[in-house]
Design a protein with these regions (language model features):
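Alpha-helical scaffold segments that form or flank carboxylate-/histidine-based iron centers
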Residues: 16-21, 45-60, 107, 132-149, ...
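A contiguous pocket-lining binding segment that forms or flanks enzyme active sites
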Residues: 125-194
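Internal, conserved structured core segments that host functional sites
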Residues: 89-155
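Conserved alpha-helical segments that form or flank metal/cofactor-binding pockets of metalloenzymes
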Residues: 55-88
Length: 251
C-alpha cells in the first residue's frame, strides 16, 4: 500500500509531498533517538538538559510535518506517521553500521554531521515542491542558525553544535580527532544520499526541479540522475563545511 493511500493520510496531498514528508519525519525521529541517548550519559546536568531540549524539538518538528499530510478523520497521529515513514525505515541502517562509536563526543558529532546531511537533503529537495503545500514543507524544514539559547524554531541539533564547538575550542587534541571523524562520517552520509536517490526516483525528480529553480542547467534524459546527484552532493558538501565551521572543526 502506498503511504499516500494509508489510513489517516489526506488523499488530496500530492504524492511528492507525502514522499518528502515521510523522509524528513524519519530523519527527525532518528535525530530524537540520538540526542535522547546522548542526553542520558551526558557529562553534566546542563548538557543533559540541553540535549533533551533538542530531542524534544525534533519530535515537535516531526509532528508539524505529519500535520501537513494528515486527514482530519480521527486516525491516531502515530499511525499516520508510521505509514508515511515506512518506505524509509532502513534508510539509515547502513550508515549507522559503518559509523559505530563508543566515544560520547564522536557519537554526538555523528548525529550532527550524518543526520544533518539527511536533513539538508530534505530541505534542498523541498525546493522542487510546488504550491502552498510545498511552501508549508519548506517553512517547517528551514532552520535558524544554532546558538546557546536556540529558539523553538531552531534545528534539533542546535544545542549539539554549540556544545561541540565549546568542547573543540577547549581541547585541541579532541578538535583534531573530531575533525577526522567528521570527514569519515560525511563521506558515509553522502554515500547514503546516493543510495537513496537510486532507490527513490521521485526524489531525483524533486532534486531536478529544485536545481532548475536555483538556476542550475542540468542535462535531460538518461544523464539527469547523475547530474542531480552531483549537484546535490556539491550543495550538501557546502552545507557540511559551514556546519563544521560553526563547530570550529576543519572540514
Amino acid at each position: 500500500m502506498s503511504p499516500r493511500t494509508a489510513a489517516g493520510v489526506d488523499p488530496t496531498v500530492p504524492a511528492p509531498v507525502v514522499e518528502l514528508v515521510g523522509l524528513a519525519a524519519y530523519t527527525e525521529l532518528a535525530e530524537f533517538g540520538l540526542l535522547a541517548a546522548r542526553s542520558v550519559d551526558a557529562p553534566d546536568l546542563a548538557t543533559r538538559q540541553a540535549l533533551a531540549d533538542g530531542a524534544d524539538r525534533a519530535l515537535a518538528r516531526q509532528r508539524a510535518l505529519f500535520a501537513l499530510v494528515s486527514a482530519d478523520d480521527g486516525v491516531v497521529p502515530g499511525v499516520v506517521g508510521a505509514a508515511v515513514m515506512e518506505p524509509f525505515d532502513d534508510v539509515l541502517a547502513d550508515f549507522d553500521a559503518r559509523t559505530r562509536t563508543d566515544a560520547w563526543a564522536e557519537g554526538l558529532l555523528k548525529g550532527v554531521v550524518g543526520h544533518g546531511v539527511a536533513q539538508d537533503f530534505c530541505r534542498i529537495v523541498a525546493g522542487g515542491l510546488d504550491g502552498s503545500r510545498g511552501r508549508a514543507v519548506r517553512k517547517v524544514l528551514e532552520r535558524p542558525a544554532p546558538g546557546p539559547e536556540a529558539g523553538a524554531d531552531a534545528g534539533a541539533d542546535a544545542e549539539a553544535i554549540w556544545l561541540l564547538a565549546r568542547m573543540a575550542a577547549a581541547d585541541e587534541v579532541l578538535a583534531s580527532r573530531l575533525a577526522l571523524w567528521g570527514r569519515r562520517v560525511v563521506g558515509e552520509a553522502l554515500g547514503m544520499v546516493t543510495v537513496l536517490l537510486g532507490r527513490r526516483p521521485e526524489l531525483v525528480v524533486l532534486g531536478a526541479e529544485a536545481a532548475a529553480r536555483l538556476g542550475a542547467d542540468l542535462p535531460a534524459g538518461r544523464e539527469t540522475e547523475g547530474a542531480v546527484r552531483s549537484w546535490l552532493v556539491a550543495r550538501l558538501t557546502g552545507e557540511h563545511t559551514r556546519r563544521m565551521d560553526r563547530m570550529r572543526l576543519a572540514a
